Amino acid sequence: MGAYWNRIERAPSEFDPGDLDWQVDAAQRAGKQIVLCVGPLKTFGYPEFFVPAHHLEKPLREGILVQPATHQALLAAALAFVTWIVERYKGRAAIVAWQVEHEAVDPLGVEHSWRLSAGWVKQEVDAVRKADPTRPVVMNGFLPTSTPVRLQQWWSTRDQGDSLSVAQQLADVVGIDYYPRHALLSLGSTTLYLQGEHVRGNQRRRKELFSWAHGAGKRLVVTEGQAEPWEAVTVPPNPPGRSMYSCPPEQMIENYNRCIGWARDANSSLDAYIFWGAEYWIARQRSGDSRYLDAVARILSESSYS
């Protein structure tokens, strides 16, 4: 669940958390556990950037590393928002952890090349821990599964490491975003996909991560397990009678089983596996295709983790 800064602070120092209150209330009534992403700059959900316009006089310059010394006013506002959110919701028993940023130090998709510095993110983590020292801090990062993505991610974050590396340094719980198959581009009726789940050469980073967690006694979760299509458009297509190649229903089960197998092979465990794409399952069901919801129900009924 996300605390979207520009939706809550619509005017300077004027906070309206009504929508988030409603979501937390609903989850709590249903007996669910919540990882609340406090942002503040980056939160999941397109466009993954939710800074209020009144805190950003001009767009962040492309290619820069956003640092405390260069954006002091923005950082002060961000820390104030984070503290306000944690103070407001730390009394909610349903909240089990706070997530700081979303893929914190990686570039913002393909749209923007600026990045947050590790020092910036550390100040946000410190603010969360100061406001609530009782709950763990989660930080997530994208796990590359194809050679082109792995090389691009390494190149763009080579100065301070990617979000998984920074999460290992700063977080209590490291979250893995796992999307093994996604579209690269589409021309007419033809789509080019990157598919790397079975390529041995791309497994080293994952093995290192699980080995590190086991040796250091650290906690791992899958914060985003691909459970909806990732096509060459923003909104996943919903074609009647067909499944998109990037994630048909059976792929959800394969993704889950693969991640559980990784943990088992490393003599480790995953604290949680979060399926990413529930809105899509409901959209498919409303279109007469219940296979996505059926796949989730099968996993929940058969898995020892459920």
Predicted regions and their residues:
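Alpha-helix N-cap and loop-to-helix initiation/capping positions
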Residues: 11-19, 69-77, 112-120, 155, ...
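Active-site beta-loop-alpha junctions enriched in small/polar residues
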Residues: 2-4, 39-43, 100-103, 142-148, ...
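Substrate-binding cleft of secreted/luminal carbohydrate-active enzymes
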Residues: 217-306
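Active-site groove signature of glycoside hydrolases
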Residues: 41-46, 63-114, 270-275
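Glycoside hydrolase catalytic-domain groove-lining segments
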Residues: 115-119, 123-126, 130-141, 145-235
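Hydrophobic faces of well-ordered beta-strands that scaffold small-molecule active sites
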Residues: 1, 34-38, 96-100, 137-139, ...
